[in-house]
């Protein structure tokens, strides 16, 4: 019987699972939409929703709790300054999971997990900024 077992193991150790979900949470908070497997998306949703609720609290202790969980201070600043105020009047339900077919390599069920009222320009914004910075570095080196 599987009574009392919470979550999935994903054939990973506890530390690997913890870091995997921290990395997924950072990606989701940065891009506001990611594509992952359906079971990972289902387990990621309560983690990120709790982080957004901490962000809505807004005090120093909540900020330190979020930093301890995901370890990326730039994303924590974005969570507290941009994402949490957007959901100030919403009590939970910040994320949606949409099924996205099956992956070709192993036929795994895929899903898109995104914020409900997401900023559509946020997806890939960090990558665009990085590419522009690399472009200016390459131009400066060539000159």
UniProtKB/Swiss-Prot annotation:
Bias kind Basic and acidic residues: ranges: 124-133
Pfam families (UniProt xref): Ribosomal_L17
Entry's Gene Ontology cellular component terms: cytosolic large ribosomal subunit
The UniProt record lists the keyword Flavoprotein: no
Listed InterPro entries: Ribosomal_bL17, Ribosomal_bL17_CS, Ribosomal_bL17_sf
Domain of life: Bacteria
PROSITE patterns on file: RIBOSOMAL_L17
Sample GO molecular function, one term: structural constituent of ribosome
GO biological process: translation
Family matches, as SUPFAM superfamilies: Prokaryotic ribosomal protein L17
UniProt keyword annotations, A-Z: Ribonucleoprotein, Ribosomal protein
Region of interest (Disordered), residue spans: 124-143
Family stated for the protein in its record: Belongs to the bacterial ribosomal protein bL17 family.
Quaternary structure and interacting proteins, as annotated: Part of the 50S ribosomal subunit. Contacts protein L32.
Protein name (Swiss-Prot/TrEMBL): Large ribosomal subunit protein bL17
Species of provenance: Mesorhizobium japonicum (strain LMG 29417 / CECT 9101 / MAFF 303099) (Mesorhizobium loti (strain MAFF 303099))
